[in-house]
Design a protein with these regions (language model features):
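C-terminal structural segments of small proteins and small subunits
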Residues: 47-85
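Short aromatic-glycine-(Arg/Gly/Cys) micro-motifs in beta-strand/loop hairpins
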Residues: 1-16
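A short, charged, amphipathic alpha-helix used as a generic interaction element across diverse proteins
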Residues: 26-41, 45
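Short glycine/serine/proline-enriched coil/turn segments at secondary-structure junctions
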Residues: 13, 46-47
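A short, structured loop/turn motif at beta-sheet edges
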Residues: 1, 24-28, 59-62
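A short, exposed loop/beta-hairpin motif centered on an aromatic-Gly-Thr core
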Residues: 15-24
Length: 85
C-alpha cells in the first residue's frame, strides 16, 4: 500500500510530515486530511490564518496527490450537522 504525507501549508510556511501514513488509496488520504483539519480547528480554534491554510497530501516521490483547504473541511462539517430528511 502507498504511503501518504500530510504537509500543512500555512501562509508561506510548509510544515512537512516526515513519517506519513500507509493508506489503501487517495480516497482514504482525503478522509484522513479532512479529519486532521477538523481536529486541529477544534483544538486550536478557527482563525483567519488557519482558514486560509491547506493540507498538501503527497506520495513517496513528493508528488501532490491532493490539496485540502481548511475552510472546505469546516464548510463540510456544517453541511453534515444539518438534519437531513
Amino acid at each position: 500500500m502507498p504511503r501518504y504525507f500530510f504537509n500543512a501549508r500555512i501562509a508561506d510556511e510548509l510544515i512537512s510530515d516526515p513519517e506519513g501514513e500507509v493508506l489503501r488509496n487517495p480516497d482514504r488520504a482525503w478522509e484522513m486530511a479532512r479529519a486532521m483539519i477538523r481536529e486541529l480547528l477544534k483544538t486550536e480554534g478557527v482563525d483567519e490564518r488557519l482558514l486560509n491554510a491547506t493540507i498538501e497530501v503527497t506520495d513517496d516521490e513528493g508528488g501532490i496527490v491532493l490539496e485540502f483547504p481548511f475552510a472546505e473541511a469546516l464548510l463540510d462539517a456544517e453541511d453534515e450537522s444539518r438534519t437531513k430528511h
